């Protein structure tokens, strides 16, 4: 955020424990901004499943016009399945943000923090510290396909994965550039021995973009073997780049090895800043603990630190 006079942040606490942890996140961001001389202007939006019955959607129809003026979106959580089915609330909020604001990078740090016990024996802070760079707008979650002959013995469902050159190249480029700022080690998650069209293409673009970064050591693992190594030897990783589905898996598995996904942060980035980026904790809305005063705000605070 440095280099601009006033930074405008849209705050959306959302559902469940998002409403409980967001005040801690905002206070922390404002305190850090004051300490480092960063001018911040915060605007809060009370969009959630609460209003679904009234307006028939998670947020108003002009949401994009309202949010387009901001530099960043600071987000809490989405989902209250007793009111709105999860896939409806998610696709009516976060998925819209990611796609219509072209937030094509999902960035998740995986770090073992002091005071948190890893389920992996003998691990201490510093032993686990890497990033998962997930493609965030296409791939296996492209939503192309459909269903036919529902309710009959001919019923079928088909969903198509879409990998564009632009989409693959830009996520690879981001990952290589991130690796250059760290230990210059990048791993690609693939499955080209089983997924015979899209994954070989992914591998080809990994090699092509990698040729521009000769100082970065690069390797690739099939996703099944990679999940094993993330558990057995997480210290070997620095930056992992993955497709939408594989990144989704790895970015939950990784924080689990650090003791809990409950404090993990994430960033949904439009690196060119043509649209606002979104910062949110990994945890969900957790309706089962909402109102009990036990929600941990560290994920929200850490997401705020990534935003700054």
Residue ranges and their predicted role:
Residues 10-27, 31-33, 152-224, 236:
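Glycine-rich phosphate/diphosphate-binding loop of Rossmann-like nucleotide-binding domains
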């Amino acid at each position: 955020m440095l280099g601009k006079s006033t930074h405008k942040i849209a705050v959306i606490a959302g559902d469940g424990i998002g409403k409980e942890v967001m005040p801690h996140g905002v206070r922390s961001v404002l305190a850090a901004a004051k300490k480092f001389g960063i001018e911040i202007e915060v605007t809060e939006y009370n969009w959630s499943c609460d209003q679904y019955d009234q307006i028939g959607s998670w947020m108003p129809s002009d949401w994009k016009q309202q949010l387009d003026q901001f530099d960043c979106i600071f987000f809490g959580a989405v989902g209250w399945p007793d009111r709105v089915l999860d896939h409806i609330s998610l696709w009516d909020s976060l998925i819209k943000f990611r796609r219509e604001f072209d937030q094509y990078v999902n960035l998740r740090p995986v770090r073992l923090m002091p005071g948190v016990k890893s389920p992996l024996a003998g691990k201490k802070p510093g032993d686990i510290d890497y990033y998962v760079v997930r493609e965030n707008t296409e791939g296996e979650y492209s939503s192309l396909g459909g269903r036919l002959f529902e309710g009959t013995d001919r019923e079928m469902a088909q969903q198509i994965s879409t990998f564009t050159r632009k989409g693959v190249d830009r996520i690879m480029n981001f990952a290589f550039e991130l690796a250059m700022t760290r230990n210059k080690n990048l791993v690609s998650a693939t499955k080209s021995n089983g997924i015979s069209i899209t994954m070989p293409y992914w591998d080809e673009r990994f090699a092509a973009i990698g040729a521009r970064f000769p100082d970065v050591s690069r390797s690739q693992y099939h996703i099944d073997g990679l999940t094993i190594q993330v558990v057995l030897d997480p210290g070997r990783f620095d930056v992992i780049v993955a497709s939408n589905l594989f990144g989704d898996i790895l970015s939950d598995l990784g924080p689990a090895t650090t003791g809990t996904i409950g404090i993990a942060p994430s960033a949904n980035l439009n690196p060119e800043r043509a649209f606002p980026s979104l910062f949110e904790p990994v945890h969900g809305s957790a309706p089962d603990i909402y109102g009990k005063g036990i929600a941990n705000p560290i994920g929200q605070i850490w997401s705020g630190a990534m935003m700054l």
